[in-house]
A protein has these predicted regions:
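Active-site loop segments of alpha/beta catalytic cores
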Residues: 1-52, 87, 121-377
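Short, basic/low-complexity N-terminal boundary segments at the transition from targeting/disordered tails
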Residues: 51-74
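A broadly conserved detector of short glycine/acidic/proline-rich loop/turn motifs that flank catalytic sites
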Residues: 55, 98-100, 301-303
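Short, acidic Gly/Pro/Ser/Thr-rich loop/turn segments
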Residues: 58, 94, 101-102, 158-160
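Short aromatic-enriched loop/helix-cap "lid" or pocket-rim segments at secondary-structure transitions
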Residues: 62-65, 83, 98-100, 107, ...
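Short acidic, Pro/Gly- and aromatic-enriched capping/linker segments at domain boundaries
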Residues: 69-87
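A contiguous, low-structure linker/loop signature
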Residues: 82-127, 133, 146-153
Length: 377
């Protein structure tokens, strides 16, 4: 599909449905969210999309991990403070921490002391017994609308699943120890089949789901948890089997993987992921330069003045940016677009940098990126 030229009428504001039935102001976009995010994941965007927020997050209650993690988004109310936590699909107990708004497995008493125990100790979930029909009746056409880009989040991937069963130290040792790797591989093979079974049900019962957002953290603030060679050997083949299945069924695949993971990007590509959002400790421009023609990278403006970036918190940085003269905000937006928006090598805007999205920045980023992708600049 060729991208039409920018029309100034697109900058006209209109009322659109917002949160909790309220209306909000929006630009007059030429495509709805479903169609534009689809073009974005195909590396053919019409403008610079917003990673995560241009999608509808879907984490249905019927998948036990979503309740255990205190992260349920679907039709109907869910109160994480009173309902979050409990057992995941393997019976591992998670504790919801109200002060941080998330769940964790309390460390010190791992479900598995040794990965070789997985065959005897693990009880595999009966996916067929989950109330898929009831969830479909509640969500299809209401929460999951065809005009939206609906993205189901999957909370616990491969390495994260190993951590949930063995604690962090046990998981990293099992992954790296040659004596344990055969058992880890056998476990991951069966885990992949389970995940495919779950997504077979998702595809059958939720036909408006367009993409998967798959969680598997591989790094810390300063470094990856394990070498690229180890990831290539132990994790990538299983991820690739999963993404091949999803792609064969028309589902886009986005990886959520926290950490300073530049060294792992080639593994993300080999594993079949369509998109990845680096956290802000990463140099997103370098990642985009080196890999942006092979995987959709969520980027953010790295041309911020020191008076903004010297602030301690994201909220303080956002406030400092908002205090800049409007024309400077617009200039930064134009420079950002000119840096990372190229036909054939696009990006999308990172949710991690949402604190910089002032009205002036958003407007200028939209207009500039429409000019770029529409071929008039």
């Amino acid at each position: 599909m060729s991208v039409p030229a920018f029309d100034p009428k697109e900058m006209e504001l209109k009322d659109v449905p917002g949160f909790m039935g309220m209306t909000t102001k929006s630009l007059s976009y030429p495509l709805n969210k479903h169609d534009h995010m689809t073009t974005t994941f195909k590396m053919e965007p019409w403008w610079q999309a917003f990673q995560a927020t241009d999608a509808t997050i879907f984490t249905p209650r019927i998948i036990p991990d979503n309740v255990a993690r205190g992260f349920v988004f679907e039709a109907g109310r869910f109160d994480a403070n009173t309902e979050g936590g409990g057992k995941d699909m393997f019976g591992v107990e998670w504790e919801y921490i109200k002060t941080v708004g998330g769940s964790m497995v309390r460390p010190g008493d791992p479900f598995l002391d040794d990965i070789s125990e997985w065959r005897e100790k693990l009880v595999w979930p009966d996916v067929d017994s989950w109330d898929w029909e009831g969830s479909a009746a509640k969500n299809n056409g209401t929460f999951l609308k065809p005009e939206n880009f609906n993205q189901i989040w999957f909370q616990t991937g491969f390495y994260e699943r190993l951590i949930s069963l063995m604690d962090f130290e046990g998981a990293i040792l099992a992954l790296a120890d040659e004596d344990s790797q055969e058992d880890v591989t056998a476990f991951f093979e069966k885990l992949t089949d389970l995940y495919i079974n779950i997504f077979e049900h998702v595809i059958k019962y939720f036909p408006n789901v367009n993409a998967v957002f798959f969680h598997d953290d591989w790094g810390s603030q300063k470094e990856t948890f394990f070498s690229p060679a180890l990831a290539e050997k132990m994790i990538v083949p299983h991820m690739r089997k999963l993404t091949d299945f999803l792609h064969a069924n028309g589902i886009f695949c986005e990886l959520h993987s926290c950490g300073n993971n530049y060294k792992q990007v080639h593994n993300y590509i080999a594993a079949g992921w369509d998109a990845w959002a680096p956290q802000l400790m990463n140099d997103c421009y370098k990642i985009w330069d080196d890999f942006g023609d092979k995987i959709l990278i969520a980027t953010y403006p790295m041309n911020m003045p020191e008076e903004v970036m010297s602030k301690m918190t994201d909220n303080e940085k956002g406030a400092a940016f908002a205090a800049l003269p409007e024309e400077e905000q617009r200039r930064i937006a134009r420079e950002y677009v000119d840096r990372v928006c190229k036909p054939g090598k696009p990006s999308f805007y990172s949710f991690y940098a949402a604190h910089f999205l002032t009205p002036a920045f958003r407007e200028e980023m939209y207009k500039e990126s429409r000019l770029v992708y529409g071929g008039t600049k």
